[in-house]
Amino acid sequence: HDAHIIRKIIQAIAPQPGQHLLEIGPGQGALTIPLVNSGATLDVVELDRDLAGWLQHHFADCERFTLHMGDVLKFDLHTLTQLPRSIRVIGNLPYNISTPCLFHLLESEALIDDMTFMLQKEVVQRLAATPDDDEYGRLSVMVQYFCSVEYLFDVPPGAFKPAPKVTSAIVRLVPHRHTKDQAMDSTLLRDLVRTAFSQRRKTLRNCLKPMIGDLDASALPVDLALRPENLTVADYVRLSNAICRLRHDATR
């Protein structure tokens, strides 16, 4: 691994003694070693049996290191802590699990102080995208609903061995301490955003038909002639809350 890139990532994380870190997919410990050396307490989740064995052996004498062998998508952060904003999450997420892993972690976002990930550059571009960008979509809206997104820097393909074929990037996600635009029903918001972006080239009036149904469309706070990529995160929250209220009124 490229020592310069490792140093840069560690500087971005800036781990401190006494902090509680969770590393996902530590692999051969390129980040794990400097994270442990920082004096922080480190839990790691590793799925690969051989790598887990190597990590367990390498860190056998370190009482601040705990290995959890298994799938991060089944890992419950509440087994580590009940304290709000107490865990810092770090990981090099493979492309095929990056989106499900982010959504899984966001289910426990109240426990998380911040998250720093290495992801494929195109995933980071989607996370950081704003309305009217080609990359703006479901992932952008839902992650930005929960977190501020900071695109830190790119990592060239040659920085890691074996070299991935694509450029990666480092991103920091910080859960909002106070969400000014709060969804009354976060499951409804999630369904709304998924439904909208499943047909992103259509107008909202067309792609949201299954959600709006017989509700009074004139009472909705957004222009239904717009397309899904034109709405901000706050627009989606307002729209979701309006649908929530209209559904509630319709059942009274």
Which sequence ranges carry the predicted segments?
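Catalytic cores of RNA-modifying enzymes
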Residues: 1-195, 238-241, 248-252
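C-terminal lobe and adjacent flexible extensions of AdoMet/dcAdoMet transferase-like proteins
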Residues: 175, 193-252
